[in-house]
Amino acid sequence: MLNENLEQQAQAIFKSWFIDLEPFSNRKPSDWSVSTLGNVSIMGAGGDKPQNVSPIKTDLYKYPIYSNGLSNEGLYGFTDKPKISEESVTVSARGTIGFVCLRHIPYVPIVRLVTLTPKTEIISAKYLYLWLKQL
């Protein structure tokens, strides 16, 4: 419950500052630029599930596998090698389309789960996540 409240507060502040531009008299500051997701992140999509899969986390199978879905943030199982190691954002492209999730630990995306790994010299994963949640 506390996490949900903090998430809602973060989204409200983000919207106020970066979508509605309230602190800037509703105008984009002159030193800000407009860009595309392709310019600020490395985009990818999940494919087939790995060969080595466990339904539970173990010492060997410690990396989560995520698919499209709301239940348990799309957790499918665990594997022994991550595909994405950096903090990133996933967006479901099948089933529950548009479900956005911030990923903090290495993982494997499957079944057309869209991945956005930010170019950290331009944007943070948290900013990207909050921006995508506004869409």
State each model region's role:
Residues 1-50, 56-71:
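Non-catalytic DNA-recognition/assembly elements of restriction-modification systems
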Residues 27, 55-56, 81, 106:
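Generic marker of residues within folded, mature protein domains
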Residues 44, 132-135:
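Alpha-helix boundary/capping residues
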Residues 50-53, 76-78:
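Short secondary-structure capping/turn segments at boundaries of alpha-helices and beta-strands
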Residues 68-133:
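A short beta-sheet element
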